[in-house]
Each structure stands twice: as C-alpha cells, then as structure tokens.
C-alpha cells in the first residue's frame, strides 16, 4: 500500500540553496524512494521573490516527479508550516557589506523568532527541523526557544557540510574512498571555530590518525582547510556554496529519518549536558540515529588539544547566545 505523503516545508525556497535542494527532495533523495512528498515553499512577501518562487515551481512541475504529491507557494510561515513533518529553514539574512556580526545576529533573531512561533503553532508535533541559514546553531537555538510546545530535540542545526568537507579532505589525504571512513565528527559551531576530529576515525577498520600520523598537517592544513572552506568557495566562485550545502541538508535529514545503521554522523543538536556542553546549547556532536531518534556517542576521550578546541567553539556559541538573549523575552 502506498505511503501517505509527508509534508516538507522549505524557507528561502527561491534562493540558491533552495534551487539545489527542491528537485532532489521531490526526487525522493530526502525521505526515500517510496515516500511521496508535498512541498510547502516559503519566500519573503516581496513581489520579486514570490515571482521567482513561481518560476521554480513551474520547473518542479515540468519534472513530473512521480513522488511529488503537491507543491504550494507561501509568504506566511503560518500557512507554509501547517502540519509540516520536516522543516528546512534555509532562508536567513546574509551578512551585508560593513555589517557587524551583532547586527547579523539581531536581524536573524527576528526571522527565527517568527518562524519558531509559527512552527510551535501549526507544525506536526513530531516535526523535524533543520536550520541551514547562518548563523545556523544560534538560529536553531532561537527557533527552539520560540517554540516551547515542541520538544527541544526536534530542532537541529546543520554541521553535515563541515562533516562532509572533513570526510573528503581525509579521504584525499589517505587515498581511500569516502565510503571506507567511519567515526569522524565535527564538534561545536558551524563557523571557523568548529573542531573536525578524526582521532577515533577508521578507514577500512584501521586508525585514520595512525595512517596520517602528522599533527602538523592536522593543525596547519586540515583544521584551517575545513574551517575556512566556505570562504575559499566564495573566493573561487564569487558566490557561497549552495549545491554542497543542499547536499548536506539532504544527508542530515535522510539520516535523521531513515537512520544511520550504527554509523556516526555529525548533527548540531540541543546538548543534554554531554561532554560538559551546557544543556540546550545547539552544538555539533557525533551521533547515531535509530527509529528517527538521534543519540550522542558517549564515552569518547577528550585530550587536552581537543578540549581547548571545544572550549573555543563553545565560547563563541555562548557569546552568540548572549547577544540574542534580550530578544527572547
């Protein structure tokens, strides 16, 4: 018997990431090749943005996707998020020239407060929310705090792009396929302070750390390359990474819904106090997922260098949180 369609809401749907994302969701990449979907697409109430969204929907229609059970355009989160099973919060205020980080935080806090309240009011009680729009961790925290009637665990931030970037750098370094590498993680904030950590990683069951055996490469090449990859792409292409971000969003939600078969992935999730990270801080952790529920991988040894890096990214997150506290009432 055919499955009932799942409702997937996407914000910033006419943007660059949206354009790379929507066709893949409609093709079954997000929720599985037997799961029909209804797309509920949100864009700002600006005539140009709404017109662009109509154009995107025309193209989606023209693909005649077998799994697509419907697609609707919205300018109001209260209708876009109605009964949503999955919400991908992609739209965010980008940092403009001369804009301080503080201004960026405040501008986004307003957007994510409104969206959190709308999710709280109308989304499915089991909605899985992924925040892609930056600063992703703090935006997810704001949305979560604005939705007191939804479980905090429903709100996540995307660190999968950082995870995938780290994975490909390691695969290239040790000349192994990415599929052979397991137990990699990225701790902390989706920002250059993140800490990609391969101390526990294996390739075909053998230690990656021993295979690389180069602390100088780790500190001087690997960490900065992964941490500043977004800036390097802007420098090369003139625009920010969209297709790779969309791909990471698909990976994150697919694994959250369909499970990871015991494999580690990285998700930005509300802390339960593990590894000394204050409760409710949205932080990148190694997790496994089963039956739609993620669990933090426990019992990992944190050496002095790792603790220093984790403290650094946590400090930044707590500063961001402090910067938006007055907006959360």
Swiss-Prot record:
It is an enzyme of class 1 (oxidoreductase). The active site is at residue 190. CDD domains: MDH_chloroplast-like (cd01338). InterPro entries: L-lactate/malate_DH, Lactate/malate_DH_C, Lactate/malate_DH_N, Lactate_DH/Glyco_Ohase_4_C, Malate_DH_type2, NAD(P)-bd_dom_sf. The keyword Ribosomal protein does not apply. It catalyses: (S)-malate + NAD(+) = oxaloacetate + NADH + H(+). NAD(+) binds at residues 12-18, 108, 115, 132-134. One of its GO terms (molecular function) is L-malate dehydrogenase (NAD+) activity. Pfam families: Ldh_1_C, Ldh_1_N. Substrate binds at residues 95, 101, 134, 165. GO terms for biological process: malate metabolic process; tricarboxylic acid cycle. Keywords: NAD, Oxidoreductase, Tricarboxylic acid cycle. Its EC number is 1.1.1.37. Belongs to the LDH/MDH superfamily. MDH type 2 family. Catalyzes the reversible oxidation of malate to oxaloacetate. This is Malate dehydrogenase.
